[in-house]
């Protein structure tokens, strides 16, 4: 009797392990929208002329693990304002795709660029606070930013 129960439960147990094996990796995978937020959003602070801002933020946001990300931009505006860019002026992305949008107004940003001679694991960045229009690629449902394409000066 106990052996029969074991034989019935064993295939169910194996099936459960297989399902968990397929589901678990997808649970831990960061969506493109979440990655955009991690890499580019810093709504809680204003542009900083503090020379260590980029060094701290690039480390804190995991962009110096395994390599030094050469360039990154942080946006210091409310997330909803950046998400609204997806419904503003449509422009062509740098890679030729047609899903990029330019903000109607300039936004507070901080550009971070790897300094010359900086090598992993000692990633050092130059911090440049700016006010620029941003260009983001958008996708999904809801339609949200998934890639920071560029920043451009006001053309007026």
Swiss-Prot record:
One of its GO terms (molecular function) is nucleic acid binding. InterPro entries: RNaseA, RNaseA-like_dom_sf, RNaseA_AS, RNaseA_domain. The active site is at 40 (proton acceptor), 147 (proton donor). Glycans are attached at residues 50, 62, 104, 116. Disulfide bonds join 54-112, 68-123, 86-138, 93-100. PROSITE patterns: RNASE_PANCREATIC. Keywords: Disulfide bond, Endonuclease, Glycoprotein, Hydrolase, Lyase, Nuclease, Secreted, Signal. SMART domains: RNAse_Pc (SM00092). It is an enzyme of class 4 (lyase). Its EC number is 4.6.1.18. It is found in: Secreted. Substrate binds at residues 35, 38, 69-73, 94, 113. Residues 1-28 form the signal peptide. It comes from the Eukaryota. Endonuclease that catalyzes the cleavage of RNA on the 3' side of pyrimidine nucleotides. Acts on single-stranded and double-stranded RNA. Monomer. Interacts with and forms tight 1:1 complexes with RNH1. Dimerization of two such complexes may occur. Interaction with RNH1 inhibits this protein. This is Ribonuclease pancreatic. It comes from Nomascus leucogenys (Northern white-cheeked gibbon). The gene is RNASE1.
